Amino acid sequence: VGSEMCIRDRSDVMSYAYNGERLFEGYPVSGFSTVAALYMEQVQIVTCDPDIKSVADLKGKTVSIGASGSGVYYNALDILAAYDLTEEDINAQYQDFGNSADALQDGKIDAAFVVAGAPTVAITTLATAKDTYLVGLDDEHIAKLQESSPYYEEYVIPEGTYEGVPETKTVAVVATVIARDDVSEDDVYNICYTIFENMDNLAQSHDKGKELDLEFAASVTAVPYHAGAAKYFAEKGFDVPTK
């Protein structure tokens, strides 16, 4: 967490850090705790090729899977693995969301993994310029994915989120506020109070504010909660795990 009191992270990356896995292999980070879950960030597999209907169809294709070692990169590897594919089974490109969208529009890649709250600007822009499709995940492979990586949540992206794109089943990770353990209980309590006592105002000022929900906020399992957050949620009737 560095010098910041609190930052926003993702449930999968938090788990990697706390357990010393993947990009944190051999270097576990234990000095932070969960404050609250905010909203879901969906794994969106984007293509302009109507013949790519399943993750299995990505074999042999040119696919952007995010910067090497990034959270998106590991999300892509997890989903490929659920379909018995590896990084070597595709022509992997390591691009950010904007460059991936440009490459899709120009026909330079066949598909891209984008992990962000839907609607995502890069995909919205692409869908207005070119026929765009989201590649869905089926129940069998979602279950397989969750067995090895329980921080993935099933999620259905509604029809109309992007122009011409039907309802699509995928998975998501949770955008979460975390805090250093040495931040005072009162400070973290006040952060929770400020967010969740102003949900109506936040919903009016930001699309993601509409997704704020107390029960969801208290649902993180990847990393225990800060004592200040636990105090706030207890007042609202929710017990959360602490260190």
What label would you give each PLM region?
Residues V1-I7:
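Short, small-residue-biased leader/transition segments that mark boundaries at the very start
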Residues M40-D106, D200, E215, S219, ...:
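Bilobed "Venus flytrap"/periplasmic-binding protein-like clamshell domains
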Residues S3, Y18-N19, D49-P50:
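Mobile, glycine-rich extracellular loop/lid and propeptide segments
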Residues T62, S68-D78, P150-A222:
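Ligand-binding clefts/hinges and TM-proximal coupling segments of bilobed small-molecule sensing domains
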Residues V29-F32, M40-Q42, G60, A129-T132, ...:
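Extracytoplasmic
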Residues Y16-N19, S30-A37:
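Short beta-strand-centered segments that line the small-molecule binding cleft or hinge
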Residues Q95, N99, Q105-D106, A116-A118, ...:
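An extracytoplasmic/periplasmic, membrane-proximal ligand-sensing/linker region
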Residues S11-V13, E21-R22, E87-I178, V183:
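Pocket-lining segment of extracytoplasmic ligand-binding domains
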